[in-house]
A protein has these predicted regions:
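Solvent-exposed, conformationally flexible loop/turn segments
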Residues: 12-19, 90-95
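Short secondary-structure capping micro-motifs at structural edges
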Residues: 22-26, 98-102, 113-117
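Noncatalytic modules at the cell exterior or secretory-pathway interfaces
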Residues: 31-40, 104-122
């Protein structure tokens, strides 16, 4: 029976557009990774845009997200979700990206790119991402550079 571990990554985006890099420093080609949930919780009043945020995940071989040359055209996007109005401030909308297991080294060997876009008129957007890692046999399910959080669905 494969072991499993869930990582929850929380963040806050207060700028117009922000790119975040999550380093999978102990990637295991014999394991499977699955994005199980992404949730955005707006903390301000929405603008006239039709969305609160966008998440796009993929592997970028060429451009660092901190570079001004970074664009989604450089990404291989394999998961995408848009949070739309109306979502009252403080109420979270969640998405479960189910049955999407990644064990292709070319797609997932090095980095997971998390892109959140704040269209809240300068307001903060709180988000968290849950990554479930299935290990094979007794291989430790550890991703060294990810901070682990206790998942509280009421937050």
């Amino acid at each position: 029976m494969p072991s499993q571990r869930i990582y929850t990554i929380r963040g806050q985006n207060g700028s117009a557009t922000q790119h975040r890099k999550i380093q999978l420093s102990s990637y295991d080609a014999n394991a499977q990774y699955q994005i199980v949930e992404f949730k955005i919780m707006p903390s301000g009043t929405p603008t006239n845009s039709d969305q609160y945020g966008i998440i796009t995940m993929g592997k970028n071989d060429n451009v660092d997200p901190s570079s001004p040359d970074f664009s989604d055209q450089n990404q291989i996007a394999w998961a995408h979700h848009t949070v739309r109005q109306p979502v009252p401030p403080g109420i979270a909308e969640s998405v479960v990206i189910s049955n999407y297991e990644v064990n292709d080294e070319k797609m997932f060997a090095y980095d997971l790119w998390l892109h959140t876009e704040d269209v809240m008129g300068g307001k903060d957007v709180n988000w968290f991402l849950k990554i479930m890692r299935y290990s094979v046999g007794d291989v430790p399910a550890s991703i060294a550079s990810l901070r682990q959080y206790q998942y509280n669905p009421t937050e």
